[in-house]
C-alpha cells in the first residue's frame, strides 16, 4: 500500500482522481450557467468517506458564493427516488458528487433531475453522455496514458515505492447542449468557447 505524496513507499503506485480541489470550480461553473442560482442541492453517498469529503468542499464553495445548500444523502440505489421526491421545489441546480454507486445510477439520476428541471454538474464525462448537463474533471485518457508510463518504468526496473502518486494535470469541461435545451437553459457563449467537448 502507498502512503501517497512525493515518496509514497510501499508497492502501490498510480494517479489520484480524488481531488476535492475541483469542487469550487464545479460550483463556479454552475453559477456561471445559472446566474441567479440561490439554492444548490448536493447529491452524495454518505457511505463513501471520499464522497463526504467532496461534499464538504462543495458546501464550502457554495457558501463562499452565498448559496443555500440542500443535502441529498443516499446510501444505496433505492434511496435515489425518495431523495428526489423530498427535494421538490427546494433547489435550482444539482451538484452530483463522484461516487461508484452514483456513477452506476447516472441514467436514473439524470432522468430524475430532468423531470425536476435541475441542471446537473458531474465530476466525470460519462454522466454527461448519459444526459447530465455538465462535467468538470480529470481527462481519463490522459490518466490512462500516464498510468501506462508508470507500468513502463516498473518494467524497466524502477522501484514502485520510489514512484510518486500523482494528481491529474489535464481537466475537461463537457457540456450537453441537448440537455441544456431540454431544461430551457442558454449556456453562455463564453463558457461554450471554453468547453473541451460539447455534446449536441
Which functions belong to the PLM regions below?
Residues 1-200:
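Short hydrophobic alpha-helices and adjacent helix-cap/hinge residues
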Amino acid at each position: 500500500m502507498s502512503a501517497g505524496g512525493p515518496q509514497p513507499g510501499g508497492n502501490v503506485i498510480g494517479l489520484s482522481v480524488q481531488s476535492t480541489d475541483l469542487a469550487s470550480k464545479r460550483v463556479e461553473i454552475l453559477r456561471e450557467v445559472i446566474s441567479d442560482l440561490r439554492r444548490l442541492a448536493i447529491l452524495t453517498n454518505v457511505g463513501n468517506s471520499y464522497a463526504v469529503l467532496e461534499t464538504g468542499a462543495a458546501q464550502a464553495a457554495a457558501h463562499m458564493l452565498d448559496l443555500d445548500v440542500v443535502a441529498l444523502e443516499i446510501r444505496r440505489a433505492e434511496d435515489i427516488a425518495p431523495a428526489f421526491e423530498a427535494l421538490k421545489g427546494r433547489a435550482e441546480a444539482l451538484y452530483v458528487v463522484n461516487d461508484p454507486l452514483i456513477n452506476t445510477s447516472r441514467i436514473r439520476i439524470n432522468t430524475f433531475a430532468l423531470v425536476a428541471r435541475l441542471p446537473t454538474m458531474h465530476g466525470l464525462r460519462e454522466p454527461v453522455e448519459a444526459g447530465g448537463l455538465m462535467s468538470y474533471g480529470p481527462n481519463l485518457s490522459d490518466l490512462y496514458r500516464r498510468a501506462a508510463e508508470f507500468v513502463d518504468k516498473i518494467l524497466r526496473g524502477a522501484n514502485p515505492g520510489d514512484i510518486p502518486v500523482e494528481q491529474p494535470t489535464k481537466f475537461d469541461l463537457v457540456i450537453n447542449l441537448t440537455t441544456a435545451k431540454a431544461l430551457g437553459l442558454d449556456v453562455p457563449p463564453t463558457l461554450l468557447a471554453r468547453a473541451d467537448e460539447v455534446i449536441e
